Curated annotation (Swiss-Prot):
Family membership noted in the UniProt record: Belongs to the EF-Ts family.
Organism for this UniProt entry: Parvibaculum lavamentivorans (strain DS-1 / DSM 13023 / NCIMB 13966)
Subcellular location: Cytoplasm
Entries under NCBIfam families matching the protein: tsf
Predominant localisation class: cytoplasm
MF terms in GO: translation elongation factor activity
InterPro entries in UniProt: EF-Ts_dimer_sf, Transl_elong_EFTs/EF1B, Transl_elong_EFTs/EF1B_dimer, Transl_elong_Ts_CS, UBA-like_sf
CDD domains linked to this entry: UBA_EF-Ts
Protein's name according to its UniProt entry: Elongation factor Ts
Length: 308
């Protein structure tokens, strides 16, 4: 059995909000498996469901660019927020987003492509900027959405300058209707996505393994109630529907009008747009998503510096 360390207990406690002893018990019961420990706590009603476990800590900017029927989004990381406020860095992220659009969001093609207005590749330009600014930085990821007939809308949350911020969203809408009205609807949906962080556009696109894991947790949790199997089955199905309402875009309550789901809001907008509308998909990048920043002991650093 894996050794249960204090840092493991601390990480689980920070992720779930459960008590220290409960976290230790969960890790002991699951042989130190962090994901299984989260599920164990949930079956005991000691932790809330988490769409994504893990701490988020990275600096830099999300860059978004859209030209009507296509849009690209990139994440460029830096070591400090100070650099993210640097105009040179901001221009670089904007340029890289534009370059990403030209290669349809393909990451490998992006870093190898020619940096706008330069003979260098994007990767070489970033490397040069590391020397100029004096801080490590990197292009972390890129994506693109396009539609054949319709609109791609963009939204940036916590925007520092146009097209750059901490959260970026692109959403693609297929429709032969009024493009101006379609873009406005798309922007509202993009704002909704920034706020709610859905996992999929429609439930058929959900990761089956994730749904199965959720179902297993709900079954185990329901069995703790001691109720008959037929009642448990109904309880689980009801909670799975609730799960979809929380994480599937079209099933979510629309933040702009919570009385409607996003799907109903899109359907209602068709009359104004003048044609049927299909939500093709979306991309949502949050700065530092899934990155754990190395923690430093400031007191130890000062002591080490004092010792020379």
């Amino acid at each position: 059995m894996a050794e249960i360390t204090a840092s493991m207990v601390k990480q689980l406690r920070e992720t779930t909000g459960a008590g220290m002893m409960d976290c230790k018990s969960a890790l002991t019961e699951t042989g130190g498996d962090m994901e299984a420990a989260i599920d164990w706590l949930r079956t005991k009603g000691l932790a809330k469901a988490a769409k994504k476990a893990g701490r988020v800590a990275a600096e830099g900017l999300i860059g978004v660019v859209a030209n009507g029927t296509a849009g690209a989004i990139v994440e460029v990381n830096s070591e400090t927020d100070f650099v993210a406020r640097n105009e040179q860095f901001q221009k670089m992220v904007s340029d890289i987003a534009s370059a990403a659009l030209s290669v349809e969001g393909d990451f490998d093609k992006l870093v190898a492509s020619t940096y706008p207005g330069s003979s260098k590749s994007v990767q070489d330009y970033v490397t040069e900027m590391v020397g100029t600014i004096g801080e490590n930085m990197s292009v972390r990821r890129a994506g693109c959405i396009s539609v054949s007939d319709g609109a791609v809308a963009a939204y940036v949350h916590s925007q520092v300058v146009p097209g750059l911020g901490k959260i970026g969203v692109l959403v693609g809408l297929e429709s032969k209707g009024d493009k101006t009205k379609l873009l406005e609807l798309g922007r509202q949906i993009a704002m909704h996505i920034a706020a709610t962080n859905p996992l999929a556009t429609r439930k058929e696109e959900m990761d089956p393994a994730l749904v199965e894991r959720e179902r297993n947790v709900l079954i185990a949790e329901a069995k703790e109630s001691g109720r008959p199997d037929n009642i448990i089955e109904k309880m689980v199905e009801g909670r799975i529907r609730k799960f979809y309402e929380e994480v599937v875009l079209l099933s979510q309550a629309f933040v702009i009008n919570p009385d409607d789901t996003v799907e109903k809001a899109v359907k209602a907008a068709e009359a104004d747009v003048g044609a049927p509308i299909t939500v093709v998909g979306f991309l949502r990048f949050a700065l530092g998503e899934g990155i754990e920043k190395e923690e430093s002991d400031f007191a130890a650093e000062v002591a080490a510096a004092a010792r020379g």
